[in-house]
């Protein structure tokens, strides 16, 4: 079971990803798992991870913080007896240094990336609703990861 949690954590680390939207707003981030829970079903296993992330923007626009803290919740599905995920989702929430908020949601892709979309935002983030990123894991460590995110649109 511990192995399933570790594999699922590492597979989904890039979900610890980003919101934003313009072609220049990419970056990298770190994720540290702060809570993990395994739910066993008859034919599969669900893993829920909650992480504390730091998103570091490559070229933040004027008025944006260079880094943003986020809390992300991942749900990862694995077939019973298998360690590789069959799919998953992530939702990240942010209240930035100036009090603006955003919510990102993402789905795991067959190429081991995560496709993220900003679904709700206020203040300076409001213009990014509908923006998408692709997150990929650069480095995995037990209990966390380092990842990159690039804008799709």
Outline where the language-model segments fall.
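Beta-strand-enriched cores of mature, soluble protein domains
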Residues: 20-153
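Sec-dependent signal peptide recognition
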Residues: 2-9
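Generic cytosolic/nucleocytoplasmic N-terminal low-complexity/intrinsically disordered segments
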Residues: 1-2, 41
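N-terminal signal peptide c-region/cleavage motif recognized by signal peptidases
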Residues: 14-17
């Amino acid at each position: 079971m511990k192995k399933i949690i570790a594999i699922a954590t590492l597979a989904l680390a890039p979900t610890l990803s980003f919101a934003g939207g313009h072609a220049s707003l990419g970056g990298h981030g770190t994720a540290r798992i702060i809570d993990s829970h395994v739910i066993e079903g008859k034919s599969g296993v669900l893993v829920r991870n909650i992480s504390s992330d730091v998103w570091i923007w490559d070229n933040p626009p004027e008025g944006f913080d260079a880094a943003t803290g986020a809390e992300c919740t991942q749900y990862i599905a694995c077939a019973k007896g298998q360690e590789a995920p069959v799919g998953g989702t992530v939702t990240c929430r942010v209240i930035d240094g100036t009090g603006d908020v955003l919510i990102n949601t993402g789905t795991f892709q067959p190429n081991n990336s995560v496709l993220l979309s900003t679904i709700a935002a206020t203040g300076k983030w409001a213009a990014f609703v509908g923006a998408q990123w692709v997150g990929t894991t650069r480095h995995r460590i037990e209990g966390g990861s380092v990842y990159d995110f690039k804008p799709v649109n």
